[in-house]
């Protein structure tokens, strides 16, 4: 496999030679807009991780509302959530309706939504208040943007993993990419993660030398973007935290086996604290 090539190395070296020290660069307009939109979403969306109250496996059923419930909700009468044959229903004094995965509905001053795999559906509950801290980023580094091919997976198939939001999904092994970083070439596993009913993204969940010292200890996600001609872009400036970095309501993905970069990847989202205690560094998923 031809290793990934940094698309900005030549211009970066030229800048050093002609202009002296290189100053921190502002992110490209598209990235700046995406970060601003994400900040707005965290601050205002009803299903923002900063508004999370609980996320639990529905199992044989969940009781919501009263203080002794599985999920106590102030001011909410007793409701029950159940799953049967992959379908989730909400039953209460004035409501009897299905919960469609990925579509939050109001319950008093709260929002609830269902997600996850059939037979293992989970219920997420969001409240009116925001807790925790928003997103913070390293200065933009054009030297951590790479492009190149993706090799086929060593073992094609599917594997169950926790996605960005801590919900179990069935991901497809998409392949591997090789990145020259920190003086060595690192091979990273890529998986296709479902993001909606008919949507998916190529994702890499990785650890690096900043974990626990600038970034979330468990690792970060970054999306691999298809380009023309069978190539892909990997931009570590777009690395982002799993939702468990924002709230302890979310379970935390275990690091993917082999996806560890010894060097410090000082790009993308930082960690400001306040999330779930991360899985031990030695604990890896398949």
Residue ranges and their predicted role:
Residues 91-140, 271-273, 277-278:
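C-terminal boundary/linker segments immediately following FHA domains
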């Amino acid at each position: 496999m031809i290793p990934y090539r940094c698309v900005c190395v030549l211009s970066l070296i030229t800048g050093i030679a002609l202009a002296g020290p290189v100053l921190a660069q502002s992110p490209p307009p598209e990235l700046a807009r995406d970060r601003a939109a994400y900040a707005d979403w965290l601050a205002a969306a009803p299903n923002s991780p900063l508004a999370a109250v609980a996320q639990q496996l529905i199992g044989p059923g969940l009781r919501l509302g009263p203080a002794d419930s599985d999920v106590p909700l102030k001011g909410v009468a007793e409701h029950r959530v159940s799953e049967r044959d992959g379908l989730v229903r909400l039953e209460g004094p004035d409501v009897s309706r299905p919960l469609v995965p990925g579509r939050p509905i109001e319950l008093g001053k709260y929002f609830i939504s269902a997600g996850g795999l059939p037979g293992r559906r989970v219920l997420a509950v969001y409240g009116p208040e925001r807790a925790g801290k928003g997103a913070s980023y390293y200065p933009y580094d054009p030297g951590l943007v790479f492009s190149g091919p993706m090799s086929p997976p060593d073992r094609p198939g599917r594997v169950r993993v926790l996605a960005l939001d801590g919900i179990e999904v069935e991901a497809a092994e998409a392949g591997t990419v090789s990145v020259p970083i920190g003086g060595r070439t690192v091979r990273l596993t890529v998986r296709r993660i479902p993001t909606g009913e008919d949507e998916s993204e190529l994702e890499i969940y990785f650890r690096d030398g900043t974990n626990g010292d600038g970034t979330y200890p468990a690792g970060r996600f970054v999306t691999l973007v298809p380009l023309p001609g069978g190539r892909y872009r990997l931009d570590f400036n777009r690395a982002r935290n799993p939702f468990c970095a924002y709230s302890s309501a979310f379970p935390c993905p275990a690091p993917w086996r082999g996806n560890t970069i010894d060097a410090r990847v000082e790009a993308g989202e930082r960690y400001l604290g306040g999330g779930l205690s991360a899985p031990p560094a030695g604990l890896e998923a398949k």
